[in-house]
From Swiss-Prot:
Disulfide bonds join 63-125, 169-218. The modification Phosphoserine is found at residue 823. This is Roundabout homolog 4. The keyword Glycoprotein applies. GO terms for cellular component: external side of plasma membrane. GO terms for molecular function: signaling receptor activity. Residues 623-634, 770-783 have a biased composition (Polar residues). It holds the Pfam family Ig_3. Residues 1-37 form the signal peptide. Residues 259-356, 358-453 form the Fibronectin type-III domain.
Length: 961
């Protein structure tokens, strides 16, 4: 049934499927055409190559073909089917390889030639199936034969000096025809034109010389091997009548002309030009009996040492001279001779022979495939056929049906060329030598077939991998494979789309995680561990200064600060890992929660009594500067000791609690003070017309009546990097010159206090001058006094620059309480000098709170000098506070109630205005402490130590006393 009948039957049947359903007609046709596409006509993949029978092993001729159904392979010899009846000569393997065995020989050349002719010839491979037949190209089988016996052996010869010598040699029969070479004394004999030449297979010596004596041997060589003849002994003897030549002095020879006879090169075994010599004889003597021509080639004009070649001339006045080479410069001269006598040489003439094209092609031209190229190599033609100097070679690539013709020129003595092979096919090359006259005779064409990858892999089993790749490529080109791949790809994309859809539908979007704003992570930190944030604890900073309760302007509007807490985009650096309970947390006053959450105390602190004498040793560098101003604000000075009732020294207490120097991002850093202790005291007048005056003496207080003042006591905690012994070893600095004077004898003015340091090794005590007001005033009176006249001169820019200092701390509850108690009437002035002098700057206005500048205080002091009954002694002016934050500005909104002496309403207004939007740093804690101090409330924390314990402890409740 043909293909058309099958299609008709399929259409008539309606495309019934396996399940009895009708399939679409195009799908049925696709399957039918796919099945038919499997059948293909035969195609030769591996062509047979030329083989040479040599040795005892068989020769192999390979032939591979593809097709569906699998084609049948048969071999043809010289166009006739090869008979496989004699397996000893021909054997066909299952894969199509033909084995050719060497037939046995009988020793006679004629019989051997007849036997070998039965297997020698051109072999062709033929592959056929029901779709067609494919024929490979022909491959020639040759047999290399070289018999053992020489037909003519050289014989021993004895020659006389000056005579010619001939050694004959007949090489053995062989195929290919063997070449003959002569050896003398075990070395190749060097041939010289005109002296030693090879004619046929015989060696000819024109004029025998003594150095020609030796052992000569003839050697025959072909592909089958080489054969050596017997050694022949050649002896050169002197003639019996040999005598010295006599000089003919009376004869003179004049060489007149040297003429080239044959301008065209002569093809043959003796190529070379010939010249005609003409000379003239003069002299009284009779003419000479014979003449000899002497010539030599002059390759270099500076070369004068080459030997002369002698040739006997036949004529008496002219003669023909041969044995020359084209393209050489020769020197010629003639010598007369008569028997044993000879005359002087004639003059020398020069003749330049022109170059001719080489008379022989290059030898041993071969082709071999490379990596995408074809390598052509050859050997130069024989020296006698150069006909000049070889200047290069011309290479021709013969064109065919698939490749165009091309040619290349190789310059110099290079004897190989690489030709790029752009496509597979047959490459045939010819090579010719080039001289100054042009290209010579080209060589016979040499061909090379470049096969495709599939053919090479099938012929060479080692390249089976590349052939498999070609098969895979051909398979992937089939339509059914392409259709199946497209369907699989579509299904894969559909599955990926479904997975992505389901994941997006059920997926959980991750939030920003721990990357929060600065204020948010601070609040979250205090919620997680609020034991490190005090609520009106020993980290509160007291504030003092004149307050203006009549103004209602906002602090933020004065300082140009946005009252809102800016939420910057910086990511928090807070570590959320659980912290060790042994590592305490430092107070954070930069946020709302850090300012409101108080640390628990083990016992309520004890307020120091104003009557208690205070003596503290100050470092020497406090007195080394003349500036009375400290480097930080007096209200926010260095932190004092946590509890005056601690049994341990400051450094030991910190070590006992494992207090470490920890710095939290965007939190208050741990302050390292440069002084172990600081005592600040300053007094502010209650009336605008009264100012402070200088003290008459360092140890006396003014007996005059002075307004109520706020005295702030501060004691700096132990430094983390210094032990208590180092701090205790520092001497007490001398009293500043501005504080020295006549001591006062007023008992009420002797207000020197001696404080006991909370350490096992107390510091040496030294008396300090203390001011004692003769007229005590209430806390409200002292704090609600009229602001100082110099408080309006402090600028916010100077305060902003002071805010960058990190050497400030806060007041302890004891200091706040002491400040409140001393404000009634007893004032404890202290002396502290900043290690770094700072220029005076305008005052800063905290809404209703203002601080006088150094210049203002100085003016007040000068003005108060004349009114000694109203002012006290100002030992240490206050330090400037940093620039207020929006929280402090917002605090001013609740100050109006306090100005009307309505304490409950002021507290309510103050607390209600303290929201999280502006309570974001420690400045609000300072301002709130001022407000609490002004109302006269005392703060008693429940725990006196400074170590923050309990990571998840709840914050203590607020206590207002």
């Amino acid at each position: 049934m043909g293909q058309g009948e099958e299609l008709r039957a399929a259409v008539d049947s309606g495309g019934m499927g396996l399940l009895g359903t009708k399939c679409p007609l195009p799908l049925l046709l696709l399957f039918i055409m796919g099945g038919k596409a499997l059948d293909s006509p035969p195609q030769i993949l591996v062509h047979p190559q030329d083989q040479l029978l040599q040795g005892s092993g068989p020769a192999k001729m390979s032939c591979r073909a593809s097709g569906q159904p699998l084609p049948t392979i048969r071999w043809l010899l010289n166009g006739q089917p090869l008979s496989m009846a004699t397996p000893d000569l021909h054997y066909l393997q299952s894969d199509g390889t033909l084995l050719l065995h060497r037939p046995p020989t009988h020793g006679r050349p004629q019989d051997d030639q007849n036997i070998l002719s039965a297997i020698l010839g051109v072999y062709t491979c033929e592959a056929s199936n029901r779709l067609g037949t494919a024929v490979s190209r022909g491959a020639r089988l040759s047999v290399a034969v070289l018999q053992e016996d020489f037909r003519i052996q050289p014989r021993d010869t004895v020659a006389v000096v000056g005579e010619s010598l001939v050694l004959e040699c007949g090489p053995p029969w062989g195929y290919p025809k063997p070449s003959v070479s002569w050896w003398k004394d075990g070395k190749p004999l060097v041939l010289q034109p005109g002296k030693r030449t090879v004619s046929g297979d015989s060696l000819m010596v024109a004029r025998a010389e003594k150095n020609d004596t030796g052992t000569y041997m003839c050697m025959a060589t072909n592909n089958a091997g080489q054969r050596e003849s017997r050694a022949a002994r050649v002896s050169i003897q002197e003639s019996p009548d040999h005598k010295e030549h006599l000089e003919l002095l009376a004869v003179r020879i004049q060489l007149e002309n040297v003429t080239l006879l044959n301008p065209e090169p002569v093809k043959g075994p003796k190529p070379g030009p010939a010249v005609w010599l003409s000379w003239k004889v003069s002299g009284p003597a009779a003419p000479a009996q014979s003449y000899t021509a002497l010539f030599r080639a002059q390759r270099d004009p500076r070369d004068q040492g080459s030997p002369w070649t002698e040739v006997l001339l036949d004529g008496l006045l002219n003669a023909k001279l041969g044995g020359l080479r084209w393209g050489q410069d020769y020197e010629f001269k003639v010598r007369p001779s008569s028997g044993r006598a000879r005359g002087p040489d004639s003059n020398v003439l020069l003749l330049r022979l022109p170059e001719q094209v080489p008379s022989a092609p290059p030898q041993e031209v071969t082709l071999r495939p490379g990596n995408g190229s074809v390598f052509v190599s050859w050997a130069p033609p024989p020296a006698e056929n150069h006909n000049g100097f070889i200047r290069g070679y011309q290479v021709w690539s013969l064109g065919n049906a698939s490749l165009p013709a091309a040619n290349w020129t190789v310059v110099g003595e290079q004897t190989q060329l690489e030709i790029a092979a752009r496509m597979p096919g047959s490459y045939c090359v010819q090579v010719a030598a080039v001289t100054g006259a042009g290209a010579g005779e080209p060589s016979i064409p040499v061909c090379l077939l470049l096969e495709q990858a599939m053919e090479q892999s099938a012929r060479d089993p080692s390249k089976h991998v590349s052939w498999t790749l070609e098969q895979l490529r051909a398979t992937l080109k089939r339509p059914e494979v392409i259709a199946s791949g497209a369907v699989l790809l579509w299904l894969l994309l559909l599955g990926i789309a479904v997975c992505i859809y389901r994941r997006r539908k059920a997926g959980v979007h991750l939030g920003p995680g721990l990357y929060r704003y600065t204020s948010e992570d601070a609040i979250l930190k205090h919620r997680m561990d609020h034991s490190d944030s005090p609520w009106l604890a020993d980290t509160w900073r007291s504030t003092s200064g004149s307050r203006d309760l009549s103004s209602s302007s906002s602090l933020s509007s004065r300082l140009g600060v946005d009252p809102r807490d800016p939420l910057d985009g910086r990511r928090s650096l807070i570590s959320w890992d659980p912290r060790s309970p042994g590592v305490p947390l430092l107070p954070d006053t930069s946020t709302f929660y850090g300012s409101l959450i108080a640390e628990q105390t083990s016992s309520p602190p004890v307020r120091p009594s104003p009557q208690t004498p205070a003596a503290r040793r100050l470092p020497p560098k406090l007195t080394g500067t003349s500036s009375p101003w400290a480097s930080s604000d007096s209200l926010c000075s260095r932190r004092g000791l946590c509890s005056p009732r601690m049994s341990l020294a400051p450094a030991e207490a910190w070590k006992a609690k494992k207090k470490q120097e920890l710095h939290q991002a965007n939190s208050s850093p741990l302050l390292q003070g440069s002084h172990p202790m600081e005592i600040w005291a300053w007094e502010l007048g209650s009336r605008a017309s009264k100012n402070l005056s200088q003290s008459p003496g360092p140890n006396t207080c003014s007996p005059r009546e002075a307004p109520g003042a706020v005295v702030a006591w501060r004691a700096l905690g132990p430094q983390l990097h210094r032990n208590s012994s180092e701090l205790a070893a520092r001497p007490l600095p001398p009293t500043p010159l501005s504080l020295r004077g006549a001591p006062s004898h007023d008992p009420q003015s002797q207000c020197v206090e001696k404080l006991q340091a909370p350490s096992s090794d107390p510091l040496p005590a030294a008396p300090l001058s203390v001011l004692n007001s003769s007229r005590p005033s209430s806390p409200q009176a002292s704090f609600l006094s009229v602001p100082s006249p110099g408080s309006s001169n402090l600028s916010s820019s100077s305060l902003s620059s002071l805010e960058e200092e990190d050497q400030d701390s806060v007041l302890t509850p004891e200091e706040v309480a002491l400040c409140l108690e001393l404000s009634d009437g007893e004032e404890t002035p202290t002396n502290s000098v900043s290690p770094m002098p700072r220029a005076p700057s305008p005052p800063a206005t905290y809404g209703y709170i203002s601080i006088p500048t150094s210049s203002g205080l100085a003016d007040m002091g000068r003005a108060g000098g004349g009114v000694g009954s109203e002012v006290g002694n100002l030992l240490c002016p206050p330090r400037l506070c940093p620039t207020p934050t929006p929280s402090e500005g917002s605090l001013a909104n609740g100050w109006g109630s306090a100005s009307e002496d309505n304490v409950p309403s002021a507290r309510a207004s103050l607390v209600s205005s303290s929201d999280g939007s502006f309570l974001a740093d420690a400045h609000f804690a300072r301002a709130l402490a001022v407000a609490v101090d002004s109302f006269g409330f005392s703060l008693e924390p429940r725990e006196a130590d400074c170590v923050f314990t309990g990571m998840w402890a709840r914050p203590p409740p607020l206590e207002w006393t």
